[in-house]
Regions:
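N-terminal cap/lid segment of alpha/beta-hydrolase-fold proteins
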Residues: 1-36
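Conserved alpha/beta-hydrolase
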Residues: 64-79
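Short beta-strand element of the alpha/beta-hydrolase
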Residues: 36-46
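Short beta-strand/loop motif that positions the catalytic acidic residue
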Residues: 171, 177-179, 183
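Conserved alpha/beta-hydrolase "acid-adjacent" motif
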Residues: 184-193
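Primarily recognizes the serine-hydrolase "nucleophile elbow" in alpha/beta-hydrolase
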Residues: 91-158
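C-terminal catalytic histidine-bearing segment of alpha/beta-hydrolase fold enzymes
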Residues: 201-255
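The serine-hydrolase catalytic nucleophile loop
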Residues: 48-60, 74, 189-190
Length: 255
C-alpha cells in the first residue's frame, strides 16, 4: 500500500462548545495534495482525558495514504463518561469532513483502547449514530466486555440485541480488530474472543495481531515519567504502527 506524500495538520479546531465548560477540540491530519473526495476517518483515543496528541503518529501515517483523519479530544471523566464528546465529534465529521477533502457521508470509525470499545459499540448499534453513516469500524487494542463509552452497554452483550441481529449479515458494518500480540495492558484475547463472537453472528471481521504491545500498535511507547504514550523512533514499533494504519486504510477502501 503506497503513500501519497506529505501531510498537513490543522490543530485545535473546536468541535463542541458547551456553556460553562472548555471547548472541545480536534486535530485534522490530511494529505497535502488535493485528491478526489473519499472516506473520512474519525480516530478516538483511549481513556486518558484529552489525549488526542497520543494518536498523532498513527493519524499522520493514515493521512499519508490519502485519507483525512480527524482526532478529537474527549474526556472519560465527564459525567456521561465522554459520550457527548464522542457523539459531537461524529457529527462534526459528518458536517465538516468535506472541508478537509473527506466525505462526511462515509465515515470509518476507529478507536484505540477505550476508544476501540466506543467505536465497536456504535458499529453494533447503527441506530445510535444519530444519522451518521459508519461504513467500517476498527478497534485497536480494545476490550469489548465492558460498557462502551459511546453507548453505555458492552459490545459483546449488544451482539445478542435485536438491533445488532438485524445489522448482521450482508448489510453489517465491516469490523477490523487490531491487537498487539505482546499487549500486557489489555490481552489480545479480548480481540480474539470478540472477533469469534462477531463471526458466530455472521459479522464480517478482519483480525490482525502485530508483534507489538499496547502502545506500539499506535507508533508510540509508554513514558512512565510523563504517564502517557509518546512517539517512538524504534523501527519495530513503527512497523507495528504501519500495520495498524494499513488496516484502517484497507477498511476504508474495501467498502
Amino acid at each position: 500500500m503506497s503513500r501519497t506524500g506529505t501531510t498537513v495538520e490543522i490543530r485545535d479546531l473546536i468541535y463542541l462548545s458547551e456553556e460553562g465548560a472548555p471547548p472541545r477540540r480536534l486535530d485534522v491530519h490530511r494529505p497535502a495534495a488535493d485528491r478526489p473526495v473519499g472516506p473520512s476517518v474519525l480516530l478516538w483515543h483511549g481513556i486518558g482525558p484529552d489525549e488526542k496528541d497520543v494518536l498523532a503518529p498513527l493519524a499522520r501515517e493514515i493521512a499519508s495514504h490519502g485519507l483525512p483523519v480527524l482526532v478529537p479530544d474527549w474526556r472519560s471523566d465527564a459525567p456521561d463518561g465522554g459520550r457527548s464528546h464522542l457523539m459531537a465529534s461524529l457529527r462534526y465529521v459528518r458536517d465538516h469532513a468535506v472541508e478537509f477533502g473527506g466525505d462526511g457521508g462515509r465515515v470509518v470509525l476507529a478507536g484505540w483502547s477505550a476508544g476501540a470499545g466506543a467505536a465497536m459499540g456504535l458499529a453494533l448499534r447503527p441506530g445510535a449514530t444519530e444519522g451518521v453513516r459508519v461504513i467500517a469500524a476498527v478497534g485497536v487494542a480494545g476490550r469489548y466486555d465492558l460498557p462502551a463509552r459511546s453507548t453505555g452497554t458492552a459490545p459483546l452483550a449488544d451482539l445478542d440485541s435485536t438491533e445488532a441481529g438485524a445489522g448482521a449479515g450482508a448489510g453489517a458494518v465491516p469490523v477490523t480488530l487490531v491487537h498487539g500480540a505482546a499487549d500486557s495492558v489489555l490481552s489480545s484475547s479480548h480481540s480474539r474472543d470478540f472477533g469469534a463472537a462477531l463471526r458466530t453472528k455472521g459479522w464480517p471481521v478482519t483480525s490482525l495481531e502485530p508483534a507489538s504491545d499496547h502502545a506500539g500498535v499506535i507508533m508510540t511507547e509508554y513514558d512512565p515519567a510523563r504517564g502517557l504514550c509518546v512517539p517512538s523512533t524504534s523501527e519495530h514499533v513503527l512497523r507495528a504502527g504501519r500495520e495498524t494504519a494499513a488496516a484502517i486504510v484497507s477498511a476504508a477502501r474495501t467498502v
